[in-house]
A protein has these predicted regions:
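PLD/PLD-like phosphodiesterase catalytic module centered on the HKD motif
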Residues: 1-193, 197, 201, 849
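Conserved segment of the helicase C-terminal RecA-like domain
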Residues: 501-506, 510-540
């Protein structure tokens, strides 16, 4: 009997680009086992944080396990042992012998045992980013070695002692925290990181091309201020002006510049401080923009001007400043330039983007502190679910406060004490919750927009401090969304609905600065029944194409996709709430399409090409093609962009709509290549197509397949409204040549250009998403298809989607597609509540009428 592939030995390693991580493999093994045994030398707090949702699942589902670990090299911290001891379903023992160094994971299910052994300890880096080699094997194929591993585990277990509170207390007395490895830089010279090197090179090239302004887009915590200092040092302007919106930021920026540039005088221009004669001046916008202050300087006083948080530059104060001064070079910096209240920031900088690094790239290049995000269910109080309309009393209910405290204690933090930020919806809530937390033994304060600069700075200093009585948490609404620097923040708590992905990233970013006192940041998001929960996966994934399937996939498999050691974990209820929000969201509407189109146009300074939408991470162009009021990119431009002046005949528009709406998904390459060959004026297309498909795609064209292609491109396949909509669209004729009508339309060069543009996009989409065909079919595993797609891709002569239900047999092609609603709605009728189920990984029972 042939061995099932899933039980064959395989290598388990980390490569997020291949969607492979050790952590994901372990999650699957944990959640599908009846019991488990681990023998792992090194277990870090970060490793438990990376798998917390998984360990909680094991506890909640009463899945028992055994863990053997040690105190070898003093790596395992007392805090980690305390966390393990909380899991009543796990029996933990300490191996007291010398040289304990295994990394073995054993999982039992019924009469099967799966094992993973290799190099991975339970640390966040070993689970996600390190170069690790682990071998997976199963008792189904490797029974002898499995028995030997179990025998060795039993020996270790007998030689180990139980983990108890008393043992932890004794261990804590003698435990010495390992010192972090530090690279000693003899010259003490600070050098640019990866992002900064690329950006500096780009800025230099812009100036060589006589550009006098540029925009830098860089995620919070990636070192924008240091980058600016490096560039100013390279340019060496006689005078420089650095503009920010808060005094504390100006002071911090000046300190940064002083570490990089030693031979220039630097001063502050804010409030009562007016250091006019310094080479480099750091100013607050509130002071420098005033006529009586800016006129203290000549218009060409500064050779180089930098504006931080430049997305604010639409305000009159910034505009007056920019219009007054005439520097040789102007640099704008922002993590979120899109938030500019309809003001075109890109135009302000002549569309010169020096460099762009978003959160996901910064994580990939290890520029930020890893985070462990936990989406957990907000509390239901007296049958009232927290939602967008919840009143104040519900938000500050004693039971909710106790629930929040219980959760933030459970999820914890990295380091010796908590340095936390808690974001809430309104000022009154911040003040009341701070008061209630203080009554329960915490040291907290609430900061609102009314707080003075001094009050804010004192609160931030206290939160950073490790002295007794320092703040544990600061409650705030939005004043900390940007422009603050508290590197020690190790816990971010979100007690508010996510209203936008930009604000979400800004608040998340408060904890992402690296600091020696933390290994990771804990992010706890209390998810209520909020309408815009769909912004959570958009923000965390960085995928702004608004494709619902991609958003759902990220919620389910985000850990596989996200770069670096960070993790994203949802409990089941919060996951369902996000799925519900995705389902309900109107992400295909014209309003969103128009908004994202003009956002991209503003960024590029021109009408975007079709390929630009994916290239620059904008909305999925399929939303344009599948929108029934558009169906083509031309139609979008014609309706909404006054700069677009192309006019097509009604027939030309119909051809464009057909190709865009019906073929651009790239689900089958044959029709696309047929059209391309037809445009090249090939006659007898059948022969050319067979050759092209064989040579380029290794696909053999059968007679039935070619018949299907002809039917589709001559509208013989179509049925219902689709047939009427495109009844005049005929790409090829019955003699395998380009149709006379299509040939004539192609004499219009602009029409031809747009058809080819759609074809190029569609062919690339096929290559990216649909070229891994299943056996000799045109279908791919794990892809989404409509009933009409199935009819076409199975080469049926007609579109029978309107009469297709549980299954249908097609005699002409001898195919029988079966459709199963595996997850059924609770309110369906008893007559259709079929017990569809998997018997084993290779056998599925489906029931139909």
């Amino acid at each position: 009997m042939e061995t099932l592939q899933e039980f064959q030995p395989r290598l388990v390693y980390n490569n997020y680009k291949e969607h492979i991580k050790v952590s994901h493999e372990l999650e699957l093994l944990f959640k599908n086992c009846d019991s488990f045994e681990l023998s792992v030398a090194f277990i870090a707090d970060s490793g438990l944080a990376a798998l917390k949702e998984c360990f909680d699942y094991l506890r909640d589902h009463h899945i028992r396990g055994k863990i053997i670990t040690s105190t070898y090299l003093g790596f395992n911290a007392p805090s980690m042992f305390k966390k393990l001891l909380k899991y009543e379903n796990i029996e933990v023992k300490i191996f007291e012998g010398k040289g304990f160094h295994p990394k073995g994971y054993i999982f039992h299910k019924k009469d099967q045992t799966d094992i993973m052994i290799g190099s991975s300890n339970l640390t966040q880096n070993a689970l996600a980013v390190n170069q690790e080699w682990n071998l997976f094997f199963s008792s189904d194929t490797q029974k002898d070695i499995v028995l030997k591993v179990e025998e060795e585990f039993d020996k270790q277990w007998k030689q180990s002692i139980p983990l108890t509170n008393e043992w932890i207390e004794d261990y804590q007395k003698v435990y010495v925290k390992p010192q972090r490895h530090q690279t000693i830089n003899v010259s003490k010279e600070i050098k640019p990181n990866y992002m900064q090197k690329n950006a500096l090179e780009s800025l230099d090239n812009l100036r060589k091309n006589n550009k006098d302004k540029s925009l830098l887009i860089s995620a919070t915590g990636t070192g924008k201020t240091y980058l600016a200092a490096f560039d100013v040092k390279a340019v060496n302007p006689k005078r420089m002006l650095f503009v920010v919106h808060r005094r504390s930021i100006a002071i911090k920026a000046m300190e940064t510049f002083k570490t990089i540039i030693k031979d220039k005088s630097m001063g502050l221009f804010s409030g009562d401080n007016k250091d006019l004669d310094c080479d480099y001046i750091f100013a607050t916008i509130q002071t420098i923009y005033k006529p009586e202050n800016r006129q203290l300087f000549s218009k060409k006083e500064f050779d180089y001007i930098i504006i931080d948080e430049v997305h604010k530059a639409g305000a009159n104060s910034y505009q007056e400043l920019v219009n007054y001064f005439k520097p040789q070079f102007l640099l704008g910096m922002s993590a979120t330039p899109e938030r500019s209240d309809d003001f075109d920031i890109y135009k302000m900088f002549d569309y010169n983007i020096a460099y762009e690094i978003r959160l996901q790239q910064a994580m990939e290049y290890d520029l930020l502190c890893p985070f462990h995000y936990y989406g957990i269910t907000d509390m239901t109080i007296d049958d009232h679910v927290i939602d967008d309309k919840s009143d104040f009393n519900l938000l500050v209910d004693e039971k909710r406060v106790d629930y929040v405290i219980d959760k933030i204690n459970d999820y914890g933090y990295s380091g010796d004490r908590v340095h936390g930020l808690i974001f809430v919806s309104r000022k009154e809530e911040a003040c009341k919750l701070s008061e209630m937390f203080n009554q329960k033994g915490f040291h907290t304060c609430a900061l609102t927009g009314e707080a003075s600069e001094k009050q804010r700075q004192e609160a931030m200093d206290s939160l950073e401090s490790n002295e007794e009585g320092s703040l544990d948490y600061i409650f705030t609404v939005d004043i900390f969304n940007e422009g603050i620097d508290i590197p020690k923040v190790n816990q971010v708590v979100m007690l508010r609905p996510t209203q936008s992905s930009i604000i979400f990233i800004q608040q998340l970013g408060r904890g992402l600065r690296k600091n020696d006192e933390k290994d990771y940041v804990v992010v706890i998001d209390f998810i209520g029944n909020y309408e815009k929960n769909f912004f959570i996966p958009i923000a965390l994934s960085g995928n702004t194409n608004f494709n619902k399937d991609n958003l759902r996939r990220f919620v389910s498999e985000g850990n596989l996709i996200i770069p670096g050691a960070s993790t994203i974990q949802f409990d089941e209820i919060s996951k369902k709430r996000i799925f519900d929000a995705i389902d309900a969201a109107k992400l295909d509407g014209l309003k969103l399409i128009k908004e994202k189109y003009f956002e991209l146009k503003n960024k590029l300074g021109r009408i975007p090409k079709i390929c630009d939408f994916e290239k620059y991470g904008s909305i999925d162009i399929q939303k344009v093609f599948q929108n029934n009021k558009l169906r083509s990119y031309h139609q979008l431009l014609k309706k909404y962009d006054k700069d677009y002046t192309v006019q097509f005949t009604e027939l030309e528009e119909q051809y464009l709509k057909f190709i865009s709406n019906k073929l651009s998904s790239g689900k089958r390459i044959q029709e696309l290549e047929t059209i391309r060959l037809a445009i090249e004026k090939k006659s007898n297309l059948m022969n050319y197509l067979k050759e092209e498909m064989k040579n380029t795609y290794n696909i053999e064209i059968s007679d039935i397949n070619y018949e299907s292609i002809i039917n589709y491109l001559t509208q013989n396949f179509a049925a219902g409204t689709s047939k009427k909509t495109y009844e005049d669209v005929e790409i090829i004729d019955k003699n395998n040549n380009i149709s006379p009508t299509f040939s004539k339309l192609l004499l219009n060069n602009e029409f031809k250009r747009q058809v080819i543009e759609v074809l190029d996009y569609s062919i690339q989409k096929y290559k990216n998403e649909y070229n891994n065909r299943y056996k000799d079919t045109d279908l791919c595993l794990y892809k989404k298809y409509t009933f009409e797609d199935v009819c076409r891709l199975l080469n049926w002569e007609k579109n029978l989607s309107s009469v297709m239900f549980g299954y249908r047999y097609d005699e002409h092609t001898n195919t029988l597609p079966i459709f199963v609603n595996y997850e059924k709605e609770e309110n369906i009728s008893d007559t259709t509540k079929y017990n569809d189920r998997f018997v084993d990984p290779q056998t599925f029972i489906a029931i139909s009428k």
